[in-house]
Amino acid sequence: MTAILGRGTCGAHLTLLFTVEDASADPVEQGSLGTGICVEDGIEAIARGQAGEPRLSIRFIDDVGDTRLYQQVLDLLYEEVDAAKSMQWELAVRMHLPISQGFGMSAAGAVAAACAFQRALGLPHEESLRRAFSIAHRVERANSTGLGDVAALAAGGIERRIAPGAPYSGTQLTRGPGIAQGWSEATPVVLAWRENPGRHTSEYIDHPDWKRLISEAGSTQMSSLSAGGWDSSRWQDLIDSAQTFSRDSRLIDDASRGILVEAGTNAAERAGFAG
């Protein structure tokens, strides 16, 4: 029996500042305003399908992950693509960055997997990509693993999110309601993380006190970052706003972030990279 194969990749996303916009009951309209950086390293997924009763077998290469997330992606794909339901699927997932370290890996994994399944089915690239972002956003909101990572990844580069929500939605996969803009710069990035995983995202975005602190600090910074053009001339504005946000939201003082930042700063100074 002939097997079909598809590959999907998606880079990670580093949030620099954000708000929590979850008042709507519709997950498509939930999200965040904010800014961040998309990087090339993230997740690669290879999907293999054969005709048969629908099921999914998942294998993680060199790491561990959340099997439930990938089943949720496929379940949503079943609702939109009938051909996916007539397949026995195998999914191999390779992670190039750790999970639960603030790199938006759940969003990246959902996008990569959704793309892999659809490419295996031979669906057009643009349609597949839009549907992947749409599905990934809904999975993220269902699990409270993220707010704006998917919209950010859809924009790419150094991004700002100026309207909350999924980047694509509806049967025609039209743009919105989320709006994000990005500009790209081929810049090497050094990523650092703690040995042990940090708090789950839901511990912040679902907690009323954290939600208030984060949203107030994020809204203040986005009032200026949302105005005007968005290109490399805004880099210093972005860095200054991110530092102010981390202090005003008190996130810098939580989960030993300040210690990690200090260690990174000291390492940069020793290497002669500190500005």
PLM regions and their residue ranges:
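ATP-binding N-lobe of GHMP and related small-molecule kinases
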Residues: M1-I99, V261
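A generic local secondary-structure boundary/capping motif
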Residues: I4-G6, L33-G36, Q101, E140-A142, ...
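DPxDG-like acidic metal-binding loop motif
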Residues: F103-E126
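Alpha/beta catalytic cores of group-transfer enzymes, especially the acyltransferase/condensing modules
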Residues: L129-G176
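Acyltransferase
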Residues: P177-S241, F245
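Glycine-rich, charge-dense phosphate/pyrophosphate-binding loop(s)
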Residues: W230-G275
